[in-house]
C-alpha cells in the first residue's frame, strides 16, 4: 500500500476540484496512482460535481412541510429553472424539507443528516449534481414550532404540492379551534407572500436598516429648506411609516387594505371564541439575495470549450 501524502491529496484536489476527503479516498482506492485516482473520482461523479459546484445556483425550489405543531421551510438552489421541474430534484427538496422537521434548521447539521436509502443529505446532493448535470446547493432552512396551536404552510404558485418559488409558514399559538386558526393562518400566509414583511414586530426590525432609512429621510427632509424642528418631525414620520410598513403585525392586511394584521388576528380569535397569537413566521423567496451570473451564448460556449 503506497503512502498517501498530504502533497498528493493537494495535487489531486487541484487536478479534479473534488473535496479533500474524496481525494484521499480516491488515492487510497488506487494505491496512490494519480491518474487512476482522477478516473476513480470521475467514475463516482465527484470530480464533475466539484467542477460544477463553482457555478452560481440561483434557481431551484423552496419547500415547506408541517407535522403536528412544527413546520419547516427549506431552499435548495440549482443553476436553471429547468431543473426545478426534474422529478429527482423535486423529490430531494421534498425529502430534505421533511428531514428538517427533526434535524433542525442548522444547514450544516441538516446536510449531515441521514438520507433515506443510505448516506447523508450532502452525499445525496453531490450525487444529484453529477446525475442531473447542474450545480445545486442546500442554501437555508428554518423551523418554527408552537406548544399549542398550529403551523400553517403556504406556497405561492406551487409547482407541485409543497414546492414553489415562495414558501411561507405561519405559527399560531392558542386554544382556538384549529380549523379556525388554519383559516386565518392561510390568509395571513398569503399576505406575507405578497407584502414581504422584514420582521414580526417593529422592535424586531434590524436597527441598521432603521438607521439607514433615518439617514435617507433626513437627507430628503433637509432639502426641503424647512426649519430644523419641522425637518425632525418629517424624519420621525418617515421612519415611523417605514416601521409600520415592514413589521408584519403592523402591516395593513392586503385583502381589505385597511386592517392591521394584529387586529386581523384579534378579530379571528374573538370570532373563534378562543385565544390566537401570531408567534412567528417564515418567508423564503427563491434566490433572494443571490447575485445571478449573466452571460451571452457566445461567452457560455467559449467557457465550455475552455473547460
From Swiss-Prot:
Its main location: cytoplasm. It comes from the Bacteria. It holds the Pfam family EF_TS. GO terms for molecular function: translation elongation factor activity. GO terms for cellular component: cytoplasm. SUPFAM superfamilies: Elongation factor Ts (EF-Ts), dimerisation domain (SSF54713), UBA-like (SSF46934). Residues 80-83 are annotated as: Involved in Mg(2+) ion dislocation from EF-Tu. It is found in: Cytoplasm. Keywords: Cytoplasm, Elongation factor, Protein biosynthesis. Belongs to the EF-Ts family. This is Elongation factor Ts. It comes from Rhizorhabdus wittichii (strain DSM 6014 / CCUG 31198 / JCM 15750 / NBRC 105917 / EY 4224 / RW1) (Sphingomonas wittichii). The lineage of its organism: Bacteria, Pseudomonadati, Pseudomonadota, Alphaproteobacteria, Sphingomonadales. The gene is tsf.
Amino acid at each position: 500500500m503506497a503512502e498517501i501524502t498530504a502533497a498528493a491529496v493537494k495535487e489531486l484536489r487541484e487536478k479534479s476540484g473534488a473535496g479533500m476527503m474524496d481525494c484521499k479516498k480516491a488515492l487510497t482506492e488506487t494505491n496512490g496512482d494519480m491518474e487512476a485516482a482522477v478516473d476513480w473520482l470521475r467514475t463516482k461523479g465527484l470530480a464533475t460535481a466539484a467542477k460544477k459546484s463553482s457555478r452560481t445556483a440561483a434557481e431551484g425550489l423552496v419547500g415547506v412541510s408541517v407535522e403536528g405543531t412544527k413546520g419547516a421551510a427549506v431552499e435548495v438552489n440549482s443553476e436553471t429553472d429547468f431543473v426545478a421541474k426534474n422529478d429527482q430534484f423535486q423529490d430531494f427538496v421534498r425529502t430534505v424539507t421533511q428531514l428538517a422537521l427533526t434535524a433542525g434548521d442548522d444547514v450544516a447539521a441538516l446536510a449531515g443528516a441521514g438520507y433515506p436509502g443510505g448516506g447523508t443529505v450532502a452525499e445525496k446532493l453531490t450525487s444529484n449534481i453529477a446525475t442531473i448535470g447542474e450545480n445545486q446547493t442546500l442554501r437555508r432552512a428554518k423551523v418554527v414550532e408552537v406548544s399549542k396551536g398550529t403551523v400553517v404552510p403556504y406556497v405561492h404558485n406551487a409547482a407541485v404540492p409543497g414546492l414553489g418559488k415562495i414558501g411561507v409558514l405561519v405559527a399560531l399559538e392558542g386554544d382556538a379551534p384549529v380549523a379556525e386558526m388554519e383559516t386565518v393562518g392561510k390568509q395571513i400566509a398569503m399576505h406575507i407572500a405578497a407584502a414581504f414583511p422584514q420582521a414580526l414586530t417593529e422592535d424586531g426590525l434590524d436597527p441598521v436598516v432603521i438607521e439607514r432609512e433615518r439617514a435617507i429621510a433626513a437627507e430628503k427632509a433637509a432639502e426641503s429648506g424647512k426649519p430644523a424642528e419641522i425637518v425632525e418631525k418629517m424624519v420621525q414620520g418617515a421612519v415611523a411609516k417605514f416601521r409600520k410598513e415592514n413589521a408584519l403585525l403592523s402591516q395593513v392586511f392586503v385583502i381589505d387594505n385597511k386592517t392591521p394584521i394584529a387586529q386581523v388576528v384579534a378579530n379571528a380569535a374573538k370570532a373563534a371564541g378562543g385565544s390566537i397569537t401570531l408567534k412567528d413566521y417564515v418567508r423564503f423567496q427563491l434566490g433572494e439575495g443571490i447575485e445571478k451570473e449573466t452571460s451571452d451564448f457566445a461567452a457560455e460556449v467559449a467557457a465550455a470549450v475552455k473547460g
